[in-house]
Swiss-Prot record:
Record keywords: Cell inner membrane, Cell membrane, Membrane, Transmembrane, Transmembrane helix, Transport
Keyword Cell membrane: yes
Record's keyword annotation contains Cell inner membrane: yes
NCBIfam families registered for this protein in UniProt: PRK15432.1
Entry's transmembrane regions: 14-34, 39-59, 70-90, 93-113, 115-135, 157-177, 206-226, 252-272, 284-304
Superkingdom, taxonomy of origin: Bacteria
CDD domains on file: TM_PBP1_transp_AraH_like (cd06579)
Location(s), subcellular: Cell inner membrane
Name of the protein in question: Autoinducer 2 import system permease protein LsrC
Subunit annotation: The complex is composed of two ATP-binding proteins (LsrA), two transmembrane proteins (LsrC and LsrD) and a solute-binding protein (LsrB).
Species of origin: Photorhabdus luminescens (Xenorhabdus luminescens)
Recorded name of the encoding gene: lsrC
InterPro entries: ABC_transp_permease
């Protein structure tokens, strides 16, 4: 039973989502509807993108706490390039390239210079955030063109063009990780680094790719942010890194690497966003968001630790010789 829970964390996250829907529907009978699902999905798009990127990094037994700053910096570059007269496709391309470069720098520092990921990304968190503020002089970027805002305008089934593209991206990432050798290399790298190297996996390249894709996802999150609200505040992306990590852990991505699925991380992101909508429904202040995200992260980590210890204890008892078991009983 315990192994079933450990190996099917996506189902656990889905049950949590349905239970929360049920609870909030008791408070407001109109809450449980297709319109609510699409609204929560729209609000969750930024966190989902960050969770996809964080999944790859965490699968390789690393962590990136700079994604919020990368998303903010990329949103600023997006806004500045549009206001400078560049068209939307060119601005998006520049933004994605910047995100990839920022992620590549993180990956290179971790793999080539052997600096721990948490230390590296704490440093680049401040670096990218400071660069963002230097570029904007601490001011907001406004007057973004309508063509950018149309990317987040509801289209078919009340889902925006970005929403449909995101669903295609989710399916593609899930297929790559589950069905391809390239995707399984991320699991192998995080599960047993030395063993993966002996099997011929280019673990350094895999880790750099994970960080680079994470940067691209953060850049996409920055584009979505700018598209949804139509301007770019000077604190864009602040605090998103913790929520992305919490979403992944909630969805079954292990901080020890090599375990979890991108679908689980996305369900975790949806659940955290759903909590936000619940706070609005209950008319609670917005600053409860970070408290709840931190609480959920700690609770899931404690649960994971206790679950892992229980499974290891059961396995040890099963593998214990009969004579040893009898000796324990006699004592």
């Amino acid at each position: 039973m315990l192994k079933l829970i450990q190996n099917n964390r996506e189902i656990t996250a889905l049950i949590a989502i349905l239970c929360l829907f049920g609870l909030l529907s008791v408070i407001d009978h109109q809450y449980f509807s297709l319109q609510t699902v699409t609204l929560v999905f729209s609000s969750a798009q930024i966190l989902i993108l960050l969770a996809i990127g964080a999944t790859l990094v965490m699968l390789t037994r690393n962590i990136d706490v700079s994604v919020g700053s990368i998303a903010g910096l990329c949103a600023v570059i997006m806004g500045m390039s549009l206001n400078a007269g560049f068209n939307l496709p060119v601005s998006c391309l520049l933004t994605l390239l910047l995100g990839m470069c920022a992620g590549f720098i993180n990956g290179a520092l971790v793999t080539w210079l052997k600096i721990p990921a948490i230390v590296t990304t704490l440093g680049t968190l401040g670096l990218y955030r400071g660069l963002m503020l230097l570029l904007t002089d601490g001011k907001w970027i406004e007057x973004l063109p309508d063509e950018l805002k149309r990317l987040s305008a509801p289209l078919w089934l009340n889902i925006s063009p970005i929403g449909w593209l995101l669903m295609i991206l989710i399916l593609a990432m899930a297929w790559i990780l589950a069905k391809t050798t390239f995707g399984r290399n991320f699991y192998a790298t995080g599960d047993n680094l030395q063993g993966a190297r002996q099997l011929g996996v280019r673990t350094d390249s895999i880790q750099i790719i994970a960080f680079s894709v994470n940067g691209i996802m953060a850049a996409l999150a920055g584009i979505v942010f700018a598209s949804q609200i139509g301007f770019i505040p000077n604190q864009t992306g602040s605090g998103l890194e913790m929520r992305a990590i919490a979403a992944c852990v909630l969805g079954g991505i292990s901080l020890l690497g090599g375990t979890g699925t991108v679908i689980g991380a996305i369900l975790g992101a949806f659940f955290l966003t759903q909590i936000n909508s619940g706070l609005v429904l209950l008319k609670l202040p917005a600053w409860w968001n970070d408290f709840i995200a931190g609480f959920v992260l700690l609770a899931v980590l404690i649960f994971d630790g206790r679950l892992r210890c229980a499974i290891e204890k059961i396995s040890a008892n099963k593998n214990m010789p009969v004579s040893s078991k009898m000796t324990k009983v006699i004592r």
